[in-house]
Structure formats: structure tokens, C-alpha cells
């Protein structure tokens, strides 16, 4: 057992999977929608979500899902906020339909989305104490200060850098003197605006028509290179506090801090970049 009460477990022998009654949550959505005679349509929606789980199950095999589970007290793994939830999400849609070319419809549409970031965990960067065989998944012990009796800083500079990082984030400093629970911090908020312009051209009186469209996805990012980014944490784990194991008294040997560990700008599904698309469809 280490100085803060964390158990040190040996390498795993067998992995046993069973169901649990812990965890759960809710999702609440409200929306308003209105169309006007002048061709304007409006939609606004808000979703509030709270989901808790015991294991994120981020891998295809149970052994690696076990190993990639951030933990602080050995096999005691309480339910925590899910890695896949966004607590707040706002959706705003506006459209305007008019006739510019004869009696053919021209539609201008804007879609805006703003949502809070997914939760992530703060762990140690260094050798594992939890027996999973995978480094970087020990939930970090948060020092109370430069003289915390449960840690040994490599130098005064390291102590000051670590404490500056801890005190800069309320989601971390709130757990000073303890092992921080899983998924206490959040990724930054994300937002984007998409624009679509469609033009219909009727082909006779039989209902056939050509529909051309012009899309700008992530208009935010096109207008400003510093906007429209989706910043995430890889596998929802930030190995922010570096350690070189523990001494004979069970005190953590803290060697540094990496405030940006595992942060990246996601490009999945077109995030963090702008795109322009043209298209033509024939409808009949």
C-alpha cells in the first residue's frame, strides 16, 4: 500500500466479466420549431445529459478493456461520468426559402451546434501500480502543495510547475490530498456552423426537377483559423503528472507535468476543418 492508501496489485491472472447494477443516467431534450409565411423556418433544441458507468469498454477484447480502465484503488471501480456524454448540447437551425429564378425554390440554411466537451481522467504518466500491465491508467494522486508528505518532487521547479497546473483547474484542485476520481474534468466546448444553399430547377410539369446544392461545412473554421476546433483527449485519459514510481515509504516520485498530454484536434467526421461541397441531383 502506498502512502495515500493506494493498493499495489500484481499482474492480472484472469479477467472475469459480469454485469453490474451501478451506473445509469438520463437524457432530457426540449425543442421549439416554427415556420412563417414569408419562407423563414426556425428550430432550437437543447439536450441535458448525465450518464454514469463503471467501465467505458473502449476495446474489442475484455482483457484490454480491463487494462485501459483508469483506476485508483485496485479492483474497487466505482461508477463515474461516462466518457461518451456531453452534458449540454444546443442546436439552432434557420432556413429561408424564396424564388430567385422564376418560380423555382432557392433555400438558404444555417445549422449551428454548440456542446460541452466529453469528460476525461487525470492519470499518472509512468509505471503502473494497478496490475493491469498498462502504464498511464493510474488515477493521479493530487498533491496539496509543495510540502505534501505523500509525494517527493524531483526539484523545487517541478513542485512549482505541478502545483501551478493543479491550481489552474478547479476539476483537479478540488481533489487535493486524494486520488482524483475518473472523468472529473471536461474537454473544451465545441461549436460549428454549417451553411447550405439549394436551387431547384423545374423540368416541365411532370414533377421532375434538378436540385443543385452548395455546402460550407464548419463555416466557423473557414472564417477564422482559430475557431471551429474540436479539442479532445485521446481515449479520455490525460497523463498529466509524470512520476518515476514510488520510494520505499510509498511516496510518489513526481518528475514533471505535461499539461497537454493526449490533447489533440479531432478530424473525425470532418471536425476541426472546413469543407466546401457542390452537388447536383435529379429528382422525379
List each model region and its residues.
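Short, solvent-exposed micro-motifs at the edges of structured domains
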Residues: 1-284
Amino acid at each position: 500500500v502506498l502512502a495515500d492508501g493506494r493498493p499495489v496489485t500484481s499482474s492480472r491472472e484472469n479477467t472475469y466479466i459480469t454485469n453490474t447494477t451501478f451506473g445509469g443516467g438520463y437524457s432530457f431534450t426540449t425543442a421549439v420549431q416554427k415556420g412563417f409565411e414569408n419562407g423563414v423556418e426556425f428550430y432550437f433544441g437543447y439536450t441535458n445529459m448525465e450518464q454514469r458507468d463503471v467501465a467505458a469498454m473502449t476495446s474489442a477484447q475484455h482483457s484490454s478493456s480491463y487494462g485501459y480502465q483508469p483506476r485508483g484503488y485496485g479492483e474497487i471501480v466505482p461508477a463515474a461520468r461516462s466518457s461518451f456524454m456531453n452534458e449540454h448540447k444546443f442546436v439552432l437551425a434557420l432556413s429561408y426559402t424564396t424564388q430567385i429564378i422564376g418560380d423555382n425554390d432557392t433555400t438558404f440554411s444555417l445549422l449551428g451546434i454548440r456542446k460541452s466537451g466529453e469528460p476525461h481522467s487525470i492519470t499518472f504518466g509512468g509505471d503502473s501500480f494497478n496490475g493491469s500491465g498498462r502504464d498511464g491508467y493510474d488515477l493521479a494522486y493530487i498533491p496539496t502543495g509543495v510540502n505534501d508528505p505523500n509525494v517527493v518532487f524531483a526539484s523545487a521547479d517541478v513542485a512549482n510547475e505541478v502545483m501551478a497546473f493543479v491550481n489552474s483547474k478547479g476539476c483537479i484542485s478540488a481533489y487535493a490530498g486524494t486520488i482524483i476520481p475518473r472523468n472529473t474534468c471536461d474537454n473544451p466546448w465545441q461549436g460549428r456552423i454549417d451553411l447550405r444553399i439549394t436551387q431547384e430547377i423545374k423540368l416541365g410539369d411532370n414533377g421532375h426537377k434538378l436540385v443543385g446544392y452548395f455546402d460550407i461545412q464548419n463555416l466557423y473554421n473557414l472564417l477564422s483559423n482559430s475557431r471551429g476546433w474540436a479539442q479532445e483527449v485521446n481515449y479520455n485519459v490525460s497523463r498529466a503528472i509524470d512520476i518515476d514510481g514510488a520510494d520505499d515509504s510509498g511516496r510518489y516520485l513526481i518528475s514533471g507535468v505535461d499539461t497537454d498530454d493526449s490533447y489533440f484536434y479531432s478530424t473525425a467526421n470532418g471536425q476541426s476543418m472546413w469543407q466546401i461541397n457542390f452537388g447536383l441531383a435529379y429528382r422525379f
